[in-house]
Every structure is written in structure tokens, then in C-alpha cells.
Amino acid sequence: MEKHFVGSEIGQLRSVMLHRPNLSLKRLTPSNCQELLFDDVLSVERAGEEHDIFANTLRQQGIEVLLLTDLLTQTLDVADAKAWLLDTQISDYRLGPTFAADIRAWLADMPHRELARHLSGGLTYGEIPASIKNMVVDTHDINDFIMKPLPNHLFTRDTSCWIYNGVSINPMAKPARQRETNNLRAIYRWHPQFADGDFIKYFGDENINYDHATLEGGDVLVIGRGAVLIGMSERTTPQGVEFLAQALFKHRQAERVIAVELPKHRSCMHLDTVMTHIDIDTFSVYPEVVRPDVQCWTLTPDGRGGLKRTQESTLVHALETALGIDQVRLITTGGDAFEAEREQWNDANNVLTLRPGVVVGYERNIWTNEKYDKAGITVLPIPGDELGRGRGGARCMSCPLERDGI
């Protein structure tokens, strides 16, 4: 039985889940990229090469790298998992009962790696056998999608996040990402590495409509010492924060949750696009998130199964209290005002900490990387000319499965 525990943002990283760019990114076009939450189309081949360098950088540091497509393929070897995924992804109500049944039967006979490829990369009407005939087929173009691609699977951080002894399988805010959660639900329920695991499922693993209670892992920082920091962004709502906080307290996995309100705009879509924890007392930040007027609360158990809410004077003060340190050190995005805005857009603050003071980040952010170096933080640089166009850095593209506490 594998161990899955994430005790901090900065303790030694031991195991991580990544997703190499695949068919889903090949199906991004100028006409559909906005709907699929991308600003531009990427060179998939180059993005794949850059991702390989990222994965190999982690392996060279002794970190186990598991790939989402491999995990999904292996999960499909379990008959119950395959049946459940086909039922959830190919719905009678979406396609009609006869067409859905025909598609499920055809997909069920497909080699599992090819099926996994379609579960993330999508399926068009032009790819199904000509023998499958239906009014639904007759009224669609061959390039229309039966299953839309999931290019944001690249950002494995968001769909699920491990917090101490458990995982949140997150109800995603945008329709373009909501099917991602089903792939992760299947992996955590049936894959041999997780099926018999002794871990808690805090949130998101039920067949219900979570409505406004959305949560994404890019907003969740496990800062350690019984504390969790969560950003309330355009993707994570106060409702989602409350549900997760209550579950953490119920299972005695956290003593406090710090909730900070973020600006609701694209460049600040998740907390980790503007703030990451990189050493015991050190955070990388875009200055906007630590302004004195930013609203911040600490949630603690009220002793009756509910939440006690305390308004904090500043986010920095809340962090110092939670971590038991006198003064938090902030490394702000580098360069002048123009360079800092450009580098934040290119994920200069979105670094993946491998152990205290050692991070992986894009080599293109020269001004911020220089500030890290002067502050004693080691940056292992990776190329990101194509990956970075998806608006996610090393932290966004990684889901830690095992990491030491502090």
C-alpha cells in the first residue's frame, strides 16, 4: 500500500502526478481556445518537450513522477472503473439513450490506452465507426465533439489536492474542466495504488450538484503546522472553502484555515499564480495579494461542528501566527512595474518547491529568478515558452502525492 500524505508546501517532495501534453492540446484552435480556458494555441510538440524536461528535472532530484495518462489507463483495467467512467462521460441525457449505448459499447472494446487518450483528449463524430447510425449523428458535423477535450488536465494541481492525510477531489468552477474530476475520482477509487489506501476523501467525491461550492487546488496551499491557506478567487468560492474547512476539522487534519480574498481577474485566477511558499519563513508574492486592504479571515472549529470566523488585520499577520514565526519574508516579483507585470503573467510566482529553498520555475522570468538567487533560493530552471502560454507554471502542472511536513 502506497503512502499518500502532503504535510506542507515546502517539505521534501517525494511523489507527484503530472500530465504530459497530448491529444487535448492538439484540438485547441483559435476558435475554441477561449471556451476551453486557454488564451492561445500551443505548439504541442514543443510543449511536450518542455514538459519532459520538467518531469526529468524532478526525477533527477529523486522525486517519483506518475503520469495521469498511465494512471488512467491502469484504472481502466478494473472493470467497475471502466463501466463507471463510460457511464459518467457518455451520458444518455447528453447523447440520447440509443446513441449513448452504441458509443459506450464501442469504447468499451477499445484498448485501454486509446480509451484513456479519448477520455482526456475528446472524441469527435468523425472518429466513430460508420456503422453507428443515429439521428444525433445525422445532425452533427464530423468535427463536432461527442466528448470535448480536457486540455486543462495539464494543470494537475487543480483537479485534486492532497492535504495532510487526505484528498479533496475538487468540484471545478468552469464547465470546460468539470469532467476532469471524474477521471480523478476513478483513479483514487479503483487504481491499485490508491484503492486500499488509508486516506480521507474530504470533498467532491459524491454524485451531486455542488452548485456554487466550487474549489480548485491552485487556490489551496498546505502551509504546514496544522494550517491551510486558501484563496477565494474566480474559481474557488467561500462556499467551497467552508465545506473543505469543515471536513478538515471534522477529521482533525487541520487546526485553522486562512481564507484570503483575491482579485477576480484572469491574471489572478488562482492563489498560486500570485503566491507560493518557498522556504520556512519565505513566500514568493505578487505585491497586489499582500496589500493591507486585502480581506482575510482565519477559520477555526467552533466546538459545535461549525466554524468560527476571525477577521485578520493582514494576510501576513495571519501567516506569521499560523506558522509560529516572528516575521514572514516576502520575495516580490522582479523588475520594474512593467517587467513585474509581465513576469507575473508568465508565472514567475508559480514555482514548485522541492524542499526548503529549492524551487523549479520557468527560466524566462529572469528578473524574479535573480531576486530568488539573491535571497538564497535555488531555482532549477525549465523552459516554458510554450507551456507558459497555458497560464500555468511548475506548481500548476504538478499534484504532490507525498511530501514531508515541516
Curated annotation (Swiss-Prot):
Gene Ontology molecular function, alphabetical: arginine deiminase activity
Enzymatic reactions:
L-arginine + H2O = L-citrulline + NH4(+)
- Biological process terms in GO annotation: arginine catabolic process to ornithine; arginine deiminase pathway
**Group of enzyme by EC:** hydrolase
Q: Which UniProt keywords apply?
A: Arginine metabolism, Cytoplasm, Hydrolase
Q: What is its EC number?
A: 3.5.3.6
Pathway membership: Amino-acid degradation; L-arginine degradation via ADI pathway; carbamoyl phosphate from L-arginine: step 1/2
Concerning Gene3D superfamilies, the annotation shows: Arginine deiminase, L-arginine/glycine Amidinotransferase, Chain A
Xref: Pfam families: ADI (PF02274)
- Name the active site residues: C396 (amidino-cysteine intermediate)
Its subcellular locations are: Cytoplasm
| Single GO cellular component term | cytoplasm
Family designation = Belongs to the arginine deiminase family.
Q: Which NCBIfam families match?
A: arcA, PRK01388.1
What is the name attached to this protein's record? Arginine deiminase
